[in-house]
């Protein structure tokens, strides 16, 4: 009986060791980290750091609104299986219908162990509207300096989960942030050359506060955030009255919103819509703006061109 007990203990010990070994994700085991990102922007930044070292799933499809989303069965499955989950935080996926909060709770995932806010360390800007005052503005990625913070946070967690690929992640992070930094410096110089009376970026959603602070271009909008009413007659009237007091040459409309309210503003002010720009999503693969870097470059170029008219 004693011998049988000893054998049972040895058997269970072997099973435990095998289980631990099979669960380890590193280059030597041949297993890739299963990573989930909540939207296409975060997914693209992650891809630039991790390359082919991970299996990556992006939840909110390209072109859709990440503020309020209903996860599909595939999203639930991937989140449950994920080793690492990246979300924006600061009132994006956890505001509105709080879809991300419900998703990670159902998947039994733990904050700062399984899922991480890539915006950690960003200098947060707050909303101003009557119904939203005091809430965080989530659109931090529209300042390239914050995009670099996102990249560093992502690399940090990849290294923590997959230390065997540390050098790979660090090299990619260095190359990527240098590229973003160069674009950021070019943008600041570009906007310095635009006359002050033309410096006003007008969009449907008031998502350009971080952009405005970074590049010295004030912003105006129809509605403040996509979780409130969008394009009401009162909102449109307020913006039209403001624009009639300015010399702004161009308007802009985002790729992920209904363009009809901005078309009404354009008709009422005789200010043309210069371009569609990207805010909550990158473009579809193969199109201009299909990465975080190219999306930001496209936005910076189009906004500078439009305001220089």
Curated annotation (Swiss-Prot):
Biological process per Gene Ontology, one example term: cell adhesion
Keywords for the protein's UniProt record, in alphabetical order: Cell membrane, Lipoprotein, Manganese, Membrane, Metal-binding, Palmitate, Signal, Transport, Zinc
Annotated Gene Ontology cellular component terms: plasma membrane
Pfam annotation, one family: ZnuA
Compartments it resides in: Cell membrane
Lipidation (N-palmitoyl cysteine): 20
Lipidation (S-diacylglycerol cysteine): 20
Matching InterPro entries: AdhesinB (IPR006129), Bact_metal-bind_prot9 (IPR050492), Lipoprotein_PsaA-like (IPR006128), ZnuA-like (IPR006127)
Signal peptide: 1-19
Main location: membrane
Binding sites annotated in the UniProt record for Mn(2+): 67, 139, 205, 280
Membrane topology: Lipid-anchor
Gene Ontology molecular function terms on file: metal ion binding
Domain of life: Bacteria
Family: Belongs to the bacterial solute-binding protein 9 family. Lipoprotein receptor antigen (Lrai) subfamily.
NCBIfam families in UniProt: ABC_lipo_SloC
Purpose of the protein: Part of the ATP-binding cassette (ABC) transport system PsaABC involved in manganese import. Binds manganese with high affinity and specificity and delivers it to the membrane permease for translocation into the cytoplasm. Also acts as an adhesin which is involved on adherence to extracellular matrix.
Name of the protein in question: Manganese ABC transporter substrate-binding lipoprotein PsaA
Organism of this sequence: Streptococcus anginosus
């Amino acid at each position: 009986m004693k011998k049988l007990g000893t054998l049972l203990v040895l058997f269970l010990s072997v099973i435990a060791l095998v289980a631990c070994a099979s669960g380890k994700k590193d280059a030597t085991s041949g297993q890739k980290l299963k990573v989930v990102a909540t939207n296409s922007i975060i997914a693209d930044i992650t891809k630039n750091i991790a390359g082919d070292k991970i299996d990556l799933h992006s939840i909110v499809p390209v072109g859709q609104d990440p503020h309020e989303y209903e996860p599909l069965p595939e999203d639930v499955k991937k989140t449950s299986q994920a080793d690492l989950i990246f979300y924006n935080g600061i009132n994006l996926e956890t505001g509105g219908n709080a879809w991300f909060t419900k998703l990670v709770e159902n998947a039994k995932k733990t904050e700062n162990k399984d899922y991480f806010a890539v915006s950690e360390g960003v200098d947060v800007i707050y909303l101003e509207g009557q119904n939203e005052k005091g809430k965080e503005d989530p659109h931090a990625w529209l300042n390239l300096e914050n995009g670099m913070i996102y990249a560093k946070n992502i690399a940090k967690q990849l290294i923590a989960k997959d230390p065997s690929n540390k050098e790979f992640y660090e090299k990619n992070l260095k190359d990527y942030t240098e590229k973003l930094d160069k674009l950021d410096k070019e943008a600041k110089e570009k906007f310095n050359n635009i006359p002050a009376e033309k410096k006003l970026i007008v969009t449907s959603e008031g998502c350009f506060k971080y952009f405005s602070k970074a590049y010295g271009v004030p912003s105006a909008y129809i509605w403040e955030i996509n979780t409130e009413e969008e394009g009401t007659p009162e909102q449109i009237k307020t913006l039209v009255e403001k624009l009639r007091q300015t010399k702004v040459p161009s308007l802009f409309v985002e790729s992920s919103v209904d363009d009809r309210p901005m078309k009404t503003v354009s008709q009422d002010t005789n200010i043309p819509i210069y371009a569609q720009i990207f805010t909550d999503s990158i473009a579809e693969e193969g199109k201009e703006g299909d990465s975080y870097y190219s999306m930001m470059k496209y936005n910076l170029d189009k906004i500078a061109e439009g305001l220089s008219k």
